[in-house]
Amino acid sequence: MRAFLLTASLCVGIAASAAAQAPTTPPPPPRTSGSTEPVGGLLPEPRALGKAVDYVDHWVGDDSESKDGFYPSIGGLITGAGWISGGPGFRKHFHDGQIFVDGAAQVSWRGYKVGQARFELPRLVGDRLTVGSQARWQDFTQIEYFGIGADSLEAGRSVYRLKDTDVLGYASYRANDWLSVGGRSGWLRHPSLGASSGPFKRGFPEALDVFPQDPGMGQTPDFLHGDVSVTADTRDHRGHPTSGGFYRAVAGVYSDRDLDQFTFRRYEAEGVQLVPVVGKSWVLAFHGWGVFSETSSGNEVPFYFLPSLGGQNTLRGYNSYRFHDRNLLMASAESRWALFRHIDGAVFFDAGNVAARVGDLDLKKTSYGAGLRLHTQRSTLGRVDVGHGTEGWRVWFRLDDPLQLARRAPREEIVPFAP
């Protein structure tokens, strides 16, 4: 808990220091139109690029309020699913938006599959309270695992398959335009572990064979889980933020209902701050994150629930899920320039580590690199990042922003822990 509070203080410090660096000139009022407003860039944008972005924006949307009917459900799966995923979705509002239902399915490049159905009451208590429920089934076919600890070896790379069903209820109360509190509770039907499968297998050994003694490799129980959170969000746009910040604190519990071996508690603190240096043409982004686990005597954290570091959103110079352990600390900084109206260039530096004990956490694992972001005014349509760490170069193609903060959503996957 002490480390949780320290990390929360660090996140607040990031916000304070970033605010101190911000220009004294008041920012322009938020834009409310779509991608047709010019944002500016160092170079004139080719007409074909602008038309292509507008076409995608028309069919996929631009981070605006969801519209009724069928829609393409694209992206948003966990690290390692492959560079693209998609499938059909359908949503419908009833009674002037008082009731919302949604269903979607996706298949990814590597055969990851997800299906979900959601029922929500989004406008209770004067549009401040949202209450909902969701059933989610998922089958992740090739999740990477390197063993536990900061000293795990790259040569120990293995894969496993994870299938599970989770049913949960959630609620969120919006105190004002930027502050909300929330909670969720659910039942995770015992995760099924197996041999990897699906297209584009890379020939790595099976985790069940390489790490048979790691916690959770044998029997998998049902879990009753729940958490509470406090969130402050002042970003101008969720999908392509250029100003504002996002700060979150979460406390959760996961209760083993069958074996009495894997009950644990988790605490998270996370902060992101966007600092416009020259309007929206040059933006600095800072990200800090800490995750801490506690267990009672005789209990352990299953390996698929262990905080993990490495991949497209954290240490971009390392493989996905490169480091696992009970506790995690990470910080990163990114500088973005508008090259064209719809393309930003970026350079970044990431640092972090994992540890069994909170007192052993440090930021000794580092990576750096550069990338490009294709976006509308409100949403990131795609990005490529090239990162370098002590284990070489890594290239990432994704359909979201590296600061998308997927784990903040109450309806996302419970397992595995995906950075």
Describe the role of every protein-language-model region:
Residues I74-G76, G103-V107, V131-T141, F146-G149, ...:
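Transmembrane beta-barrel strands of outer-membrane/channel proteins
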Residues L129-Y170, G290-L309, G382-L405, E412-P419:
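Outer-membrane beta-barrel translocator/channel fold
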Residues V114-F119, I143-D151, L193-R202, P241-S243, ...:
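Outer-membrane beta-barrel translocator domains and adjoining extracellular loop/strand segments
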Residues G86-P88, K92, A150-R189, G218-G226, ...:
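Outer-membrane beta-barrel transmembrane strands
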Residues P88-K92, A117-L121, V167-Y173, S185, ...:
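Residues on the lipid-exposed face of transmembrane beta-strands in outer-membrane beta-barrel proteins
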